[in-house]
Regions:
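Flexible, compositionally biased loop and terminal segments
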Residues: 1-285
Length: 285
């Protein structure tokens, strides 16, 4: 579906129908069975390929909940709720491929100040619900998934921070997979906080200026325990970074899809990974 939509989007006359094709619930209900068959085939191709070429760390900018709702004549609350349920599905698909790291961009620090207060309150309630579900989810415990929430968490209400603590404590001993949620997160703010940490340590005499290098900064980021992302996926047709993992994505590969996040399918994930596998990573060379 997404490939067909991408072709149609090249022509102005077909842009409206193409967007509908990529995101309509009606359209997806028609092709869902075909997509499941294609998904099985794509998964088989991926698992039979050289596993060392698969990404170890996938990061996703989950964009398009509101546009999904608007395009389907729904309230934005339903769009965010659908986005939450989609994340649970994607987690299963990623675990199914044995990808050890998944990081998602759930809420930016800019969203907190720029979105309507009632919408942010809905998001907070969904985060609390989702984090509490994670703490009890058999899938999380069977696969030994460690939950990690990063960002300027002091910006969040106490009730959200409490739910974060519950999910992290329930999974803190797990090491097989790591699921990182970026909440109240901003890439620039993360770098600023790392630099402040370096400056403080230097002022106290514990750090020489000559010892400040890439590793010194990386070790002070919110994501210091994670490898850099191999593949960054952004949904909903926007082709920008939006202040996400600015330091960590220096050599990541990017995949953009026109599909809104709630419409993202298993096949879309496999296409993104197949596209990644087909590339030759250069790491700046």
């Amino acid at each position: 579906m997404d490939r067909t939509a991408k072709i149609l989007l090249r022509f102005r006359l077909f842009r409206g129908p193409a967007r509908y094709l990529a995101n309509s619930r009606v359209a997806w209900s028609i092709v869902s069975r075909i997509d499941r068959v294609r998904g099985v085939r794509a998964k088989s191709r991926l698992l039979s390929s050289d596993r060392s070429r698969l990404p170890s760390h996938i990061s996703i900018i989950m964009d398009g909940n509101r546009r999904f709702a608007w395009s389907n004549s729904m309230n934005t609350v339903h769009g965010h709720t659908a986005g939450k349920e989609k994340l649970k599905q994607v987690m299963r698909w990623v675990l199914d491929l044995d990808v050890p790291y998944l990081t998602v961009y759930a809420l930016s620090s800019e969203n907190i100040s720029n979105r309507p207060e009632d919408e942010i309150d809905v998001l907070y309630d969904l985060y609390i619900e989702g984090l509490n579900e994670i703490a009890l989810d058999p899938l999380i415990h069977e696969n030994r998934v460690r939950v990690n929430v990063v960002g300027r968490l002091d910006l969040l209400p106490a009730k959200v921070r409490e739910a974060i603590e519950v999910a992290e404590m329930a999974t803190q001993s797990y090491k097989r997979f790591t699921f990182t949620i970026c909440l109240a997160y901003g890439g620039r703010e993360e770098i600023i906080d790392a630099v402040k940490s370096l400056a403080k340590e230097h002022a106290e005499g514990g750090l020489e200026l000559d010892s400040i290098d890439v590793n010194a900064i990386s070790s002070r980021l919110y994501t210091s325990s994670l490898p850099d992302p191999d593949l960054v996926i952004r949904t909903s047709g926007e082709e920008r970074i939006s202040n996400f993992l600015l330091w960590q994505i220096a050599y990541s590969e990017f995949y953009f899809t026109d599909v809104h996040w709630p419409s993202f399918t298993r096949q879309d994930l496999y296409w993104a990974i197949e596209d990644y596998v087909s590339r030759g990573r250069r790491y700046g060379s």
